[in-house]
């Protein structure tokens, strides 16, 4: 019995081993959820991207503001948290549920909720440790403006199937970018 308890304790510790040196401890499952969310986004595709070429739009993803090379490790958490929250806002809207397979959408949103909880846990660890530098505020504002452009686009296109397909592909790009940021920061460890 003692060995079983020791084994379970080791498993618990390993599952919360930091995934990167961000000034906080993200559980290993955070990266797995991110990969799963990307996979779910691919599975959610309902239309061929070729059929929606006329609806494509450059939303101006703020790559330079989100790039791990440009922001410090501790600044990455609020930016990634904002990015995740904004994606969740789009996919939990009432108009979103009509556009997607409900099972895939629910799984996707659940993964995002868990990622957001991980990131917010890190934010709580950072409270009082650092003030938000101006570059971080710029990055947060750039992320908010980016998602505002996406929301306006969906409204202008009346949440059409092609508009949702364009947004799905764009969100995949944003989530991929956040995974790349975490990967680069982990390499700096």
Curated annotation (Swiss-Prot):
One of its GO terms (biological process) is type I interferon-mediated signaling pathway. One of its GO terms (molecular function) is cytokine receptor binding. Keywords: Antiviral defense, Cytokine, Disulfide bond, Glycoprotein, Secreted, Signal. Disulfide bonds join 24-122, 52-162. It is found in: Secreted. Glycans are attached at residue 101. The keyword Glycoprotein applies. One of its GO terms (cellular component) is extracellular space. Transmembrane segments: none annotated. Glycosylated. SMART domains: IFabd (SM00076). Produced by macrophages, IFN-alpha have antiviral activities. Interferon stimulates the production of two enzymes: a protein kinase and an oligoadenylate synthetase. Interacts with CR2. Belongs to the alpha/beta interferon family. This is Interferon alpha-1. It comes from Mus musculus (Mouse).
């Amino acid at each position: 019995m003692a060995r079983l308890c020791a084994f379970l304790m080791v498993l618990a510790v390993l599952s919360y081993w930091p995934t990167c040196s961000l000034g906080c401890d993200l559980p290993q499952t955070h990266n797995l959820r991110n990969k799963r969310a990307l996979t779910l986004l691919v599975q959610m595709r309902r239309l061929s991207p070729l059929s929606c070429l006329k609806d494509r739009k450059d939303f101006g993803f703020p790559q330079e503001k989100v790039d791990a090379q440009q922001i410090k490790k501790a600044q990455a958490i609020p930016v990634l948290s904002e990015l995740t929250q904004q994606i969740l806002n789009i996919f939990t809207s009432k108009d979103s549920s009509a556009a997607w397979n409900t099972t895939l959408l629910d799984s996707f949103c659940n993964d995002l909720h868990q990622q957001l909880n991980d990131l917010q846990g890190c934010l709580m660890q950072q409270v009082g440790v650092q003030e938000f530098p101006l570059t971080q505020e710029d990055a947060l504002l750039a992320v908010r403006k980016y998602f505002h452009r996406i929301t306006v686009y969906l409204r202008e296109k009346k949440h059409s199937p092609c508009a949702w397909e364009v947004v799905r592909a764009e969100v995949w790009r944003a989530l991929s970018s956040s995974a790349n940021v975490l990967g680069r920061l982990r390499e700096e460890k």
